[in-house]
Amino acid sequence: MDARGWLAAGVLTGALAGCGGSTSTPSPTAAPSTPQGLVVGPARDFGDACRLLTASEVQSATSVGPVTPGSSKDPQLGSYCTYRPAAGGSSVPVLTVQAVTEYSAAAARAMVDQSGGPTLSGVGDDARAAKPGGLGSAVYLSKGASYVVLSSIHKDVTEQALEKLAGTLAGRL
């Protein structure tokens, strides 16, 4: 389990422990800790994940029509870009790109290897395809310390389209 997974487990444990009805209050100087002493700081700033793929590249590779990118950031998980159908109608995103800068190239490769999917050759330093939870498709890739996940649950987006976009994206890292 990686540091972010331990953090999530620690938060859940802390929340459940808070339901125990104890009247004691924690020391105001006590710092929260994660299991095994892991400290998870904020994700290193990757910048805007939407800079990695243009809307026209996503549209061309997926053949789902015009898309509109929307950027967001999570302090623990990095930068996201969600490409949605420009015409509306479907609430299902066409593609989501998550990008984060890990503390080292080895850490980024380890994140890719955790996906367990088949290796994709010629894409970044390390890349794997997967079907997370059996829903949709994803490509996990690393180049240097950058770790990127391209994923889609849209019915018209193929694994081949994600792999093509991953190759384009890796060339920009």
Model regions and ranges:
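Sec-dependent bacterial lipoprotein signal peptides
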Residues: M1-A17
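N-terminal low-complexity, Pro/Thr/Ser-rich intrinsically disordered segments
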Residues: T29-A49
